[in-house]
């Protein structure tokens, strides 16, 4: 978005996209806290608005329902994984890359980011019994699958929308969903976060390798990376 567009929006009483995201995330934080403390059924839109310091009308301008208020904080809970997958260099194995990024995360994560991660874990736990929150979690998992498709396509030299890539991405994303739920449950049950963190990185790498039949996980030599074939022709041959 250009500065001119942002300025025009503001002059007309509008809101920049960056500001809109910040407001939605703040609403989501307070909604998640209330959902965890008193349940989804026990929480109203008016209570969420009061907790954030906004009008109820403003809440409904940003969200279609009170349950959908959880979506930004749930999506935030997988953002580190998505960022790590996006930045995975061809010359590194998945294990090496996750180990490097995990060390950086520990040194750079802010208190607010830690708090958001904790709220995300709690919403994922609530999603086990709250269908509307389950929708928010599955939406986040769908985004992981889409990002995985792009990563896998790059490493295999295939098209992101090809059948083989989509199958690999779907299987790997399902495995990552289970790992996230397992790790989150462990954290809420009091398991040492350091132990779970080390386990989860190993689980993720192993899950991606297993889900893709070993096709993804190893380093890729740039000068040996395969060129993208005509996948339609390959599918027809099969």
Outline where the language-model segments fall.
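Basic, helix-initiating cap at the start of DNA-binding domains
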Residues: 1-54, 71
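N-terminal intrinsically disordered/low-complexity leader segments
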Residues: 1-22, 208-238
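Hydrophobic/aromatic residues within well-ordered alpha-helical segments
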Residues: 23, 77, 98, 102, ...
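Residue-level preference for short helical/loop micro-motifs built around acidic side chains
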Residues: 41-42, 67-68, 76
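Short hydrophobic/aromatic patch on the recognition helix
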Residues: 54-63
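Hydrophobic alpha-helical connector segments
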Residues: 72, 79-123
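Amphipathic alpha-helical packing segments from all-alpha helical-bundle domains
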Residues: 124, 131-156, 166-170
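Hydrophobic/aromatic-rich alpha-helical bundle segments in the mid-to-C-terminal region
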Residues: 138, 155-202, 216-219
């Amino acid at each position: 978005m250009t500065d001119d567009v942002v300025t025009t929006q503001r002059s007309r009483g509008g809101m920049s996209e960056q500001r809109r995201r910040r407001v939605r995330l703040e609403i989501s934080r307070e909604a998640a806290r209330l959902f965890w403390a008193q349940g989804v059924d026990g929480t109203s839109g008016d209570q969420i608005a009061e907790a954030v310091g906004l009008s109820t009308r403003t809440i409904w301008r940003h969200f279609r329902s009170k349950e959908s208020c959880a979506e930004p904080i749930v999506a935030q809970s997988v953002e580190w994984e998505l960022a790590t997958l996006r930045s995975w260099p061809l010359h590194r194995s998945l294990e090496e890359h996750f180990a490097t990024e995990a060390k950086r995360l520990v040194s750079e994560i802010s208190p607010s980011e830690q708090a958001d991660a904790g709220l995300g874990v709690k919403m994922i736990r609530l999603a086990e019994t709250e269908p509307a929150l389950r929708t928010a979690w599955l939406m986040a998992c769908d985004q992981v699958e889409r990002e995985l498709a792009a990563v896998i396509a790059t490493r295999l030299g295939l098209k992101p929308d090809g059948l083989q890539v989509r199958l690999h991405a779907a299987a790997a994303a399902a495995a990552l969903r289970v790992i996230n739920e397992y790790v989150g449950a462990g954290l809420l049950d009091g398991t040492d976060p350091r132990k779970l963190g080390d386990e989860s990185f190993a689980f993720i790498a192993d899950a991606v390798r297993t889900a893709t039949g070993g096709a993804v996980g190893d380093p890729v030599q740039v000068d040996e990376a395969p060129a993208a074939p005509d996948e339609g022709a390959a599918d027809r041959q099969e």
